[in-house]
A protein has these predicted regions:
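Conserved NAD+-utilizing ADP-ribose enzyme module
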Residues: 2-11, 38-47, 53-156
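Short, hydrophobic/glycine-enriched beta-strand segments
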Residues: 12-18
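A structural detector for beta-sheet-dominated domains
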Residues: 17, 29, 73-77
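Short aromatic-glycine-(Arg/Gly/Cys) micro-motifs in beta-strand/loop hairpins
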Residues: 18-40
């Protein structure tokens, strides 16, 4: 379904979770300082989303130990058009999130009603994807993961 829009918005934004949050209203929140990468802004209240499942998987599992078989529910904000029109979708700077260009991370700065569009399973690390970002003046490698849909719903 690459490139297909789930709602009438400029592009898709995805949020991954080990739990199914279908129909739940997410509120922006500050991050736990221990769960963000070094140098990442943890104080700004937000809901983290990515412009691609690849980026979202890299952002979520980068801090874990290569979770082969990990299943993640894929959510999209059902009120994304409203969030765009009210300027509540924010692209963090590299200073705020050093790997944001690689992961496609965006922040939702207002409540978002989540809709599950499926579930994916992490298969393995894609060592051929040479992804890098700059951190503290140094080129830092980031892993990309192969994954597959285990359940996929397409809903408008």
């Amino acid at each position: 379904m690459a490139g297909k829009r789930h709602f009438d918005t400029p592009f898709n934004l995805y949020h991954l979770s080990e739990e199914n949050h279908d129909g739940q209203l997410f509120e922006p929140r500050s991050m736990d300082k221990m769960r963000v990468m070094e140098g990442e802004n943890w104080k700004t209240p937000r809901i983290c989303v990515s412009s691609s499942n690849d980026g979202a998987v890299s952002a979520v599992v980068d801090s874990m130990s290569y979770p082969t078989g990990l299943k993640l529910w894929v959510h999209v904000p059902q009120n994304l058009l409203e969030l765009f029109s009210s300027n509540k979708v924010y692209k963090p700077s590299l200073r705020q999130v050093p790997d944001s260009e690689t992961t496609g991370e965006h922040w939702l700065k207002a409540p978002a009603l989540m809709k599950v569009i499926g579930q994916i399973e992490v298969i393995d690390v894609d060592y051929s994807a040479n992804l890098y970002y700059m951190w503290d003046g140094e080129k830092t490698r980031m892993d990309r993961f192969n994954w597959k849909w285990t359940v996929h719903f397409f809903r408008n």
